[in-house]
A protein has these predicted regions:
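Ligand-binding pockets and gating/stacking loops
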Residues: 1-249
């Protein structure tokens, strides 16, 4: 919250699968102050257009009109919800409150967008970012394109807080197939439960592959200059791993 007052967006929440998943199979690393999961985004082109090319680079007048239309829609929904709430039971009221909380966040972002409307974004070159790569066919290119978008977020100071869940290991997400596609191994979830002889070598190969992607991110951060030096020198980065075996840390 402290950092968000200086940027266009409070945070950027990314993953390879998008959404929030569910309690034991989350697909986001971000939660709000109430513990509610923040939906993650995973389609590169949509991410780019939403955060770095609002309204497809439309003129300011058109973008202002779009913001005002969005605010009107939010106001109408909020007004209707007040009438609806009086007719709901206690459980449904709780669900509605969750929805209204999300709607308030939308309204807050619309107001933020309006405040930043006349402030130009820093110049950047996105020509080398692949916005159309598919995680099911080119995992490395996909992961690195997401990292490129993260760096762009820091470089333009669009946000100062970003999370990225590279892969779920529950056997359900795109990332579960990464070791199959890039290394010819079993699925991520299968490897994590494997007790056969030699399975640690498979774990090691997969961990090394992820470490290489992280190294790519670190190197690009190091070579991207900020006002006070490299992005790497001015950023706190936390890189975490999955369980070592079955459900054990």
């Amino acid at each position: 919250e402290k950092l968000s007052q200086y940027t266009r967006f409070p945070s950027l929440t990314l993953s390879t699968d998008g959404g929030v998943g569910y309690k034991s199979r989350t697909s986001t690393l971000s939660f709000d102050s109430s513990g509610v999961p923040i939906p993650s985004e995973h389609r590169q082109r949509e991410i780019f257009e939403r955060y770095f090319s609002p309204n497809g680079g439309a003129p300011t007048k058109q973008r202002r009109k779009s913001i005002h239309q969005g605010k009107k829609i939010v106001d109408l929904v909020l007004e209707d919800s007040k009438t609806l709430k009086n007719r709901l039971g206690s459980n449904d009221k709780l669900k509605l409150d969750e929805y209204l909380s999300s709607l308030n966040q939308v309204e807050e972002q619309l107001n933020r967008n309006e405040r930043w409307l006349d402030i130009p974004m820093k110049d950047f070159d996105a020509s080398l970012i692949n916005l159309d790569v598919d995680p099911t066919s080119a995992p490395q290119d996909y992961v690195r394109s997401m990292m490129d978008l993260m760096i762009l977020g820091f470089q333009t100071d669009a946000t100062r807080v970003i999370s990225y869940l590279m892969a779920r290991e529950d056997g359900m997400g795109f990332g579960d197939n990464f070791p199959k596609i890039v290394l010819g191994l079993k699925g991520h979830h299968t490897i994590s439960h494997d007790r056969a002889s030699g399975h640690w070598e498979d774990w090691g190969r997969l961990d090394r592959w992820y470490a290489k992607q992280f190294a790519y991110f670190i190197e690009k951060m190091k070579n991207t200059q900020d006002l006070h030096g490299s992005l790497l020198d001015n950023t706190m980065i936390l890189y975490g791993s999955a369980c070592s075996t079955t459900h054990n840390a």
